C-alpha cells in the first residue's frame, strides 16, 4: 500500500514538472552593458501578468510559470529603456533582450510626503497636508494642525504651552506681534511650520541652560524668498443708518439701531523675506465690526522691560456689553498702520525697527434696568440708557539692537508709547419708588467726557557673558511715564431744572528702574546654582484736583499732591537640578524693601523698611511628548501700592467719590499658592 502511494505521488510530480515553463536570460544595451529592468510574462493577447522579476546586478532574470496558452508575451521595461516586448512559444527557453536607451513617458507621478516629521526637538508640519479649501493665510492652516491651539486673541499654544518666540525663516521680525504674520502671510507661500521644543534663543546658553520653552518657525517656499509680495483688498456696501449722534439723538428713543452708510473695508499688505533682510508693512481699515487692532497684540517681549503704570483711578462709565458676538455689535471706524523692518548685517547681529499706529472711533449704545425691593410693599425702579463714542490714537515705536553669538549676547531695546484717547458718554437716568409712598425722582441727563492721554519711554539693556564654564548676566531697564487725565461730568435734573458739574484732574508720573546681575555656576551636568544682586525703584508722583463736589466736613480735602516711592535691594539665590525630562528648582530671595511717602498737602513725610523672604519651589517632569506634570509653590507678601495712600477725595466716576489712606507700616496681605498641571 505504501509503495502504491509513493508511486502515485511521483507520477503527479512528474506531470507538474512537465507543465512548468522556465524562461531566463539577460537584458543589455548595444554595447553589452547590463541594464536594470523589470521583466514580466503574460499569456499572448491578455494583460494578465503571470509572474515578474527584476534583473540582478549582471542583468540576468529568471521567470517560472505555468499556463495552458500556446504562446506568451515577455516584456522588459525600465525608466531608462522604455518598454520592449517579445512573443515566444510556451516552452522553457533562453530569451535575451538587446535594448536601446529610451525614456519612458509617465502619465502621472504622485509623491506623498509625511504630514509630520520629527528631528530631535523640532517637529515639522507639512502645510500642504493640512491646508483645506478656503484657507487663505497661514493662521487658517495652524488651526488644523494637531497640538497647536489658536486663541480668539491670536495667541498660539502648543500642547497647552504658550509659545515664547515666533520666527519667519529663523528671524524674529515682529517681536511678539505675530498676529501680523498669521493673518497676512499666504498659506501657499509657507512650506512647513516648525515647532521648536526646549527652545533656547540665546546661542551661548544652548549647551548650558536647559529650556522648557516652545517656539514656532515658518519655513517659506523658495518662490516666496527674496521677492516683494503685495496683497490688496477693497470692499464696500451699505446699511440702514440709525440716525445716531451724541447730543442730538433723543435718548428716549432706544429702539433705533446705531449704524452708518456706506460700509467699507480695505487692506494693503507688503512683505519681503530674504536671508539678511525682512520687512512687513501694512494698512488695514474698516467700519464693518472687524477689530483689526487684535493683530497688534504683543504676545511676548524680547526683553524684560520695566512696567510703567502711572496712577489714575478715574474713568467714565460706559454702556454695558450685549453679550452678543463683537462682529455683530462693534460699531467702529478702525485703522492700523504698521511698519516692521529687520536688517541682519551678519549671522549674529540684528537691527530692528517696529512702528505701529492704531486709530479708531468706537460707538456703543446700552441700557440697564434695576428693580430693588425696599420693603414688602415698596420697590425702587431705576433705568439708564447710554450712548458713547470712544476715540483712540495709539502710537508705538520700538528700536532694537541684538547680537546673539556663541561667545556672547547683547541686546538693547528702546520703546516709545504715546496715546491720545478720549471717551464721550451721554446718558439718561430715571428712577422712582412704588408702594404706599410713591415718589418720582425724575430724569437726570448725564454727560461725561474723559480725556486720557499718556506718554511712556523706556530703554532696556541686557548682556550675557561666559566666564569659563560659568555665566554672568547683567540686565538694566529704566523708564518714565506721564498721564495727565481729566474727567468732566455734567448732571442735568430734568424734573427740578438744576444742573451740577464735576471736574476731576489727575496728573500722574511714574519713574521706574530695574537692575539685576546673576552669576550661574554649573556643577557637573545636572546641577546649576545661581546667585545675584538686584535693585528696583518705583517713584509715583500724583497731583489731583476735584471741583464741584461737596465733601463731608470731617474730610474736606479735594486735592492731592504727593510722591509715593518704593525701593528694593535683593539677594537672589536659585538652586536647580535639571535633566532633559526633569527639572526641580528652589528660589530663596531675600529683599530689603523701603517705602517713602511725601504728602505736601498734609505735610506728611515718613518711610518704612521691611526685610522680606519669598521662597519658591517648582518642578516639571516630561513623561512623554504629550504628557507632563508641573507643580509649584510660593510664598509672597503684599506691601502696598499708590491706590492706598491718597487722603484727598478723587472722583472715580460720577457715582463714586472716594478717598483712601491706609497706614502701611505693618502689611498684612499674604498669599500662598500651589499649582498643579497635568496634560
Segments and roles (model prediction):
Residues 60-65, 96-98:
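Exposed aromatic-hydrophobic patches
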Amino acid at each position: 500500500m505504501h509503495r502504491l502511494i509513493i508511486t502515485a505521488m511521483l507520477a503527479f510530480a512528474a506531470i507538474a514538472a512537465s507543465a512548468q515553463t522556465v524562461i531566463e536570460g539577460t537584458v543589455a544595451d548595444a554595447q553589452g552593458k547590463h541594464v536594470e529592468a523589470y521583466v514580466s510574462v503574460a499569456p499572448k493577447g491578455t494583460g494578465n501578468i503571470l509572474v515578474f522579476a527584476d534583473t540582478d546586478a549582471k542583468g540576468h532574470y529568471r521567470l517560472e510559470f505555468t499556463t495552458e496558452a500556446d504562446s506568451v508575451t515577455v516584456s522588459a521595461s525600465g525608466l531608462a529603456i522604455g518598454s520592449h516586448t517579445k512573443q515566444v512559444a510556451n516552452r522553457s527557453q533562453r530569451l535575451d533582450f538587446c535594448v536601446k536607451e529610451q525614456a519612458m513617458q509617465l502619465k502621472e507621478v504622485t509623491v506623498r510626503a509625511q504630514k509630520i516629521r520629527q528631528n530631535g526637538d523640532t517637529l515639522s508640519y507639512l502645510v500642504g497636508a493640512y491646508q483645506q479649501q478656503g484657507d487663505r493665510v497661514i493662521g487658517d492652516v495652524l488651526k488644523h494642525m494637531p497640538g497647536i491651539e489658536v486663541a480668539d486673541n491670536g495667541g498660539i499654544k502648543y500642547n497647552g504651552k504658550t509659545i515664547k518666540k515666533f520666527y519667519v525663516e529663523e528671524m524674529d521680525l515682529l517681536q511678539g506681534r505675530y498676529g501680523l504674520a498669521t493673518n497676512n502671510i499666504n498659506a501657499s507661500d509657507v512650506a512647513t511650520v516648525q515647532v521648536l521644543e526646549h527652545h533656547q534663543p540665546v546661542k551661548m546658553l544652548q549647551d548650558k541652560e536647559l529650556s522648557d520653552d516652545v517656539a514656532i518657525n515658518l519655513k517659506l517656499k523658495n518662490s516666496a524668498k527674496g521677492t516683494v509680495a503685495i496683497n490688496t483688498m477693497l470692499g464696500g456696501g451699505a446699511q440702514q443708518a440709525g440716525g445716531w449722534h451724541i447730543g442730538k439723538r433723543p435718548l428716549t428713543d432706544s429702539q433705533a439701531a446705531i449704524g452708518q452708510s456706506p460700509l467699507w473695508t480695505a487692506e494693503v499688505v507688503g512683505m519681503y523675506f530674504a536671508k539678511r533682510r525682512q520687512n512687513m508693512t501694512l494698512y488695514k481699515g474698516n467700519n464693518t465690526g472687524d477689530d483689526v487692532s487684535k493683530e497688534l497684540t504683543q504676545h511676548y517681549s524680547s526683553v524684560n522691560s520695566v512696567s510703567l503704570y502711572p496712577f489714575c483711578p478715574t474713568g467714565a462709565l460706559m454702556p454695558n456689553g450685549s453679550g452678543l458676538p463683537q462682529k455683530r455689535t462693534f460699531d467702529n471706524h478702525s485703522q492700523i498702520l504698521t511698519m516692521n523692518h529687520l536688517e541682519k548685517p551678519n549671522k549674529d547681529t540684528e537691527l530692528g525697527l517696529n512702528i505701529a499706529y492704531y486709530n479708531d472711533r468706537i460707538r456703543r449704545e446700552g441700557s440697564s434696568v434695576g428693580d430693588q425691593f425696599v420693603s414688602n410693599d415698596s420697590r425702587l425702579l431705576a433705568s439708564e440708557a447710554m450712548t458713547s463714542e470712544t476715540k483712540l490714537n495709539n502710537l508705538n515705536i520700538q528700536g532694537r539692537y541684538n547680537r546673539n553669538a556663541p561667545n556672547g549676547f547683547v541686546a538693547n531695546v528702546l520703546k516709545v508709547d504715546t496715546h491720545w484717547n478720549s471717551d464721550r458718554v451721554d446718558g439718561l437716568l430715571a428712577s422712582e419708588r412704588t408702594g404706599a409712598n410713591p415718589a418720582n425722582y425724575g430724569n437726570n441727563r448725564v454727560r461725561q467726557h474723559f480725556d486720557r492721554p499718556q506718554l511712556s519711554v523706556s530703554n532696556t539693556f541686557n548682556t550675557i557673558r561666559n566666564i569659563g564654564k560659568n555665566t554672568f548676566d547683567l540686565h538694566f531697564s529704566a523708564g518714565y511715564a506721564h498721564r495727565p487725565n481729566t474727567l468732566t461730568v455734567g448732571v442735568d435734573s430734568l424734573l427740578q431744572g438744576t444742573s451740577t458739574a464735576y471736574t476731576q484732574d489727575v496728573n500722574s508720573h511714574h519713574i521706574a528702574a530695574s537692575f539685576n546681575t546673576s552669576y550661574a555656576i554649573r556643577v557637573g551636568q545636572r546641577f546649576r546654582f545661581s546667585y545675584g544682586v538686584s535693585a528696583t525703584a518705583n517713584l509715583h508722583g500724583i497731583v489731583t484736583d476735584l471741583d464741584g463736589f461737596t465733601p463731608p466736613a470731617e474730610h474736606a480735602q479735594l486735592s492731592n499732591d504727593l510722591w509715593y516711592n518704593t525701593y528694593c535691594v535683593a539677594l537672589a539665590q536659585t538652586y536647580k537640578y535639571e535633566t532633559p525630562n526633569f527639572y526641580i528648582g528652589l528660589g530663596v530671595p531675600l529683599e530689603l524693601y523701603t517705602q517713602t511717602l511725601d504728602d505736601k498737602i498734609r505735610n506728611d513725610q515718613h518711610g518704612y523698611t521691611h526685610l522680606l523672604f519669598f521662597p519658591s519651589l517648582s518642578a516639571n517632569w516630561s513623561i512623554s511628548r504629550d504628557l507632563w506634570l508641573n507643580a509649584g509653590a510660593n510664598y509672597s507678601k503684599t506691601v502696598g501700592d499708590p491706590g492706598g495712600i491718597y487722603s484727598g477725595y478723587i472722583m472715580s466716576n460720577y457715582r463714586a467719590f472716594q478717598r483712601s489712606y491706609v497706614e502701611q507700616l505693618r502689611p498684612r496681605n499674604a498669599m500662598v499658592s500651589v499649582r498643579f498641571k497635568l496634560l
